[in-house]
Amino acid sequence: MAENPKRPPSPWLLLAEGGRAPWEYAATLAAMPWLNRVPPGDGHPVIVYPGLGASELSTRALRSYLGRLGYATYDWGLGRNRPVPGVMEACRQRVLDVASRHGRKVSLVGWSLGGVYARELGKHLQAQTRCVITLGSPFSGDTRATNATRAYELMGGRPARHDPERAERLRRAPNVPTTSIYSKSDGVVAWQCSLNDAAPHTENV
């Protein structure tokens, strides 16, 4: 297991992150290692979750790409991603609705905070989840090891305190195929916080 960092990435990496590109392009860029390996679609549904403070627009390019490959793609349906009460229940219902509509399991793809949602949904909706893929998501380690903490607090209206029990719960991967795509040059999340523990059904790319 990688070390557990307590500090966010360097300010220089954060500056590079901010100037890299608009949200939509950045989301697609983060997904490129996975996109290069995606096989032609079989028509099964995929829900894509945006990062903190982002909306469905940020995942449009990724959804369009997956749609061209033959997957049935869906946005998360909740507008801008803010850590407010009721979000997880609404996400849960959307997975159930999409799975019921297609009569098939759903792949869950999440960027940043959206990936944390995807993992938790995969744990609670294993029967409806085909796989989980996260893009630069901080599901492992200390809540202080991200440059998005202040934004999270402002949008959620509450302080982001480190809770060891919650951290351990988030660290555990869903019991479905789970892939984490991360970058050591990530300016928002310390890359060590995006690593799955080694297991037959997990991988880090």
Q: Where do the model's predicted regions map?
A:
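Short, conserved active-site loop motifs that form the nucleotide-linked donor/cofactor pocket
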Residues: 178, 200-205
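Short secondary-structure boundary/capping segments
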Residues: 37-38, 169-172, 194-197
